Amino acid sequence: MLVPPPLAFDILHEIEQKLPGFPIVLHGSSSVPMDEVNTINQYGGHLEAAIGIPEEQLREASKSAVCKINIDSDSRLAMTAAIRKHLAEHPGDFDPRQYLKPARENMKKMYIHKIVNVLGSDGKLAQC
């Protein structure tokens, strides 16, 4: 069984102490939701050993000097899962408007979840 690599919170806290206010970006910090991986695999994909950073760690990091958390793989997984599912269930569809709509909706759902429950960004736009 694969174990996700832990974030180095000791290093994050050391940077915070030595460089107060210095913005930190976490690259490659997708959580790789297993429901999306399973959907992709169920509908013909072949993703092995997919693993990401646990959301609890991302939530904790968002409370530190981390100002940006990159989650592009989560976006791609959400889109790919929805497209694979749609095309498997509707094999005659060839118009991108038909299969991109559920893909956009799935990405939207993922981003709302991340903003509200993981990244600590909910309600911050009003502060800008």
Pin down the residues of each PLM region.
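Metal-centered catalytic cores of metalloenzymes
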Residues: 1-128
